[in-house]
């Protein structure tokens, strides 16, 4: 869908988004890569340039990194500059995931495209090992020209996907409707770049052109403000220690973060109206019976 937003309106929109950043933990301090993360595979495909980390994909391998800790509730953010030029067939991912078959997962997947065509951002939510909740949108800027922040806010009421502090998706807690919600499995934070030309670009019709390799994604501004969960602590104990009580209060349990503010709701409506290109909730060919959460989600 083409956006009708003019440049002055877009600038005003961005300034408004920044003014609301603190409401979603937007004042987080960033850390060096090695304070929070570590390479998880293809160590020779990492390049460090001061505060910037670069991961590359070539016809030998992609690369990936993971957080040193696991977390239950809070906010994670990274600034990414995506692969420039012809990125068809490539996927750069930033996500949170727990372990095991019945895992929970929140995904940003950036689907590359041919030169001049926009990146697609695919988000997905897995709960107890069940995904198939894809949404796709294009962005209101070129994500290959500069760094932009991508964040996940997670509390007991909602999961919010954000781009430059603008919400692009909300997955609400609907347990009162009998719909499971991810709230008891600590998650690691991950990113990777890999070849997915069997599906990533135009349904797999456009393949990766290896003559343009290496494909490089750049990272900076690593930030995690969340409840870290020691591996030796039981899941029920983690859920208790990461939830607010009379003795302790966590910022992510603030009543103002139990749902989007009015302004943030308007932002999300704008994103969906101007940039959403696919929503599993409306894909009746794939889901003849509407998924249960789609009947109740307001966004």
Curated annotation (Swiss-Prot):
Disulfide bonds: 227-242, 281-294
Induction comment: In fruits, up-regulated by abscisic acid (ABA) or by propylene treatment, and down-regulated by gibberellic acid (GA3) or by cold treatment during storage.
Active site: 105, 109
InterPro entries according to UniProt: Beta-glucanase/XTH (IPR044791), Beta_glucanase (IPR008264), ConA-like_dom_sf (IPR013320), GH16 (IPR000757), XET_C (IPR010713), XTH (IPR016455)
Segments forming domain GH16: 26-219
Keyword Ubl conjugation among record annotations: no
Function: Catalyzes xyloglucan endotransglycosylation (XET). Cleaves and religates xyloglucan polymers. Does not catalyze xyloglucan endohydrolysis (XEH). Probably involved in cell wall restructuring during postharvest fruit softening.
Protein name: Xyloglucan endotransglucosylase protein 6
Organism: Diospyros kaki
